[in-house]
Regions:
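Aromatic (tryptophan-biased) beta-strands that constitute blades/sheets of beta-rich domains
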Residues: 30-65, 81, 91-93, 98-115, ...
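Bacterial N-terminal signal peptides
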Residues: 11-25
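Short loop/turn segments immediately following the C-termini of beta-strands
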Residues: 37-40, 85-87, 138, 187-188, ...
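Extracytoplasmic beta-rich repeat domains
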Residues: 61-74, 105-127, 155-177, 187-190, ...
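Short coil/turn segments that connect the beta-strands within blades of beta-propeller domains
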Residues: 77-78, 130-131, 179-180, 225-226, ...
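Residue position within the beta-strands of beta-propeller blades
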Residues: 80-82, 135, 184, 230, ...
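Structural recognition of the beta-propeller blade-terminating site
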Residues: 96, 146, 197, 240, ...
Length: 417
């Protein structure tokens, strides 16, 4: 039993420990260090943003020319990382997020060619974690860099090492960092999912021979277990991030070969939501006793092609349908799959949620703000921020909105004054 001054000292120690535990969360709450934000769920938790802006749009802070690619920016501790292609080199640029000024550059040659004539730049959003930057290039090169200097720490040619095919549109899955491991859906015959040591790049474990998807994996506590959740080319793979052992799988993919799984899985308590296009649709899975069973499924609720839906208060907001055929924007009740509202012909895009506001970037380059409400859709504000085509995921960090097309990266101020 603790008594007297010992109790007081113990209480102070506990308070200090709590402060140390909470401090990192406070520091990173304003960051956007990876695809879909700090928790890979599309939710912004930084300083409040404006619910609307003037007809001319929010104030532009800076702009700069960039190379090819669909990889959106990542932002951490005031540093923005952009992964793009200039001529025949894949380039990682670190910039001051406040000014756009270059801090350092790392580059290496690439020979990637798109078989369908699309953009040939990198597709995967970089990850900033533990003082390092991790990039996954269109031709499969995985790099670990020092975030302060850009110094190359290690690199792995994942396609060669794990005998992975090129894929329909190149390599496009963002790495997942969990502690000392970097996990990637490599899609190789000798390693479908691979964990690398974050410091050295050495292989820690391999699991499955599933093909690579374009979906970003997530890590979460599910049914009391810390679990890495991948939506591979075949479907759901949930595994132990410590050793790669498979906990459960569920096949979910289109019947046609020329298709992709691209939306990130969404984990809510002990349930997992998956969505794909090409007539596949969505499924909500219940996890229990290291197994999964469907709660509901169907192609009539939310058919995500490339863009991931965002969950808010039990409702999914996202883009339904094939990108090239014209998409609708809709709201779906997660528990039932019921469509609450639908805006037909809205067009493709991406979205995130800040407080109760949908922050929508349309493929045309128009930014739209709207209430995140299942009661219906209405615009609060809309403005053209840059010319289309905009397919890269934007980043929202410390009230600044960073968005790129195939030629420029621009920063805008959305901070509520």
């Amino acid at each position: 039993m603790l008594t007297g001054g010992t109790t007081a000292r113990a209480s102070i120690a506990i308070l200090l420990l709590d402060a140390l535990i909470l401090a990192p969360a406070l520091l990173v709450a304003q960051d956007w260090p990876q695809i879909l934000g700090p928790n890979r769920n599309g939710i912004y938790t930084g300083p409040p943003i404006v619910p609307s802006f003037p007809r001319g749009g929010p104030p532009q802070i800076w702009a700069r020319d960039v190379g090819a690619g669909f990889a959106g920016p990542a932002v951490s501790a005031g540093t923005l990382i952009l992964f793009h292609r200039l001529n025949n080199r894949e380039v990682v640029d670190a910039m001051d997020a406040a000014t756009g000024k270059t801090l350092w550059t790392f580059e290496y040659p690439t020979s990637y060619r798109d078989d369908f004539g699309f953009d040939e730049g990198p597709r995967a959003v970089p990850v900033i974690a533990g003082g390092r930057v991790f990039t996954h290039g269109a031709d499969g090169w995985l790099h670990g860099l020092d975030v302060k200097t850009g110094r190359r720490l290690w690199s792995v040619d994942t396609r060669r090492v794990f005998d992975a095919p090129k894929g329909y549109f190149g390599v496009a899955t963002s790495p997942l960092v969990d502690g000392t491991r970097v996990m990637v859906n490599v899609g190789g015959k000798t390693g479908g999912i691979v964990a690398f040591d974050a410091a050295s790049g050495k292989t820690v474990w391999t699991s499955t021979s599933d093909g690579a998807s374009y979906s970003a994996p997530v890590v979460a506590h599910i049914a009391g277990l810390r679990t890495a959740v991948f939506f591979t080319r075949t479907g759901l793979v949930a595994l132990d991030p410590a050793n790669g052992s498979i906990r459960y799988q569920y096949r979910w993919r289109a019947r046609m070969a020329a298709s992709v799984n691209a939306a990130a899985p969404i984990v809510v308590k002990d349930q997992i939501f998956l969505s794909a296009s090409y007539g596949t649709g969505a499924i909500l899975l219940q996890v229990a006793n290291n197994a999964v069973k469907p709660v509901w499924s169907g192609d009539e609720s939310m058919s995500n092609h490339y863009s991931t839906s965002v969950l808010k208060d039990g409702y999914l907001y996202g883009f339904d349908g094939r990108q090239e055929f014209g998409q609708s924007l809709r709201c779906v009740e997660l528990a039932t799959g019921k469509v609450m509202w639908n805006v037909d012909g809205f067009g493709a895009g991406t979205l995130l949620i800040a407080d109760h506001t949908l922050v929508i970037m349309r493929e045309s380059g128009e930014l739209a703000l709207a209430p995140a409400s299942p009661q219906g859709f209405r615009f609060n504000s809309r403005a053209q921020l840059l010319p289309g085509v905009v397919r890269a995921y934007p980043a929202l960090a410390d009230g600044r909105y960073f968005v790129r097309n195939e030629r420029q990266l621009r920063a805008f101020d959305l901070t509520r004054r």
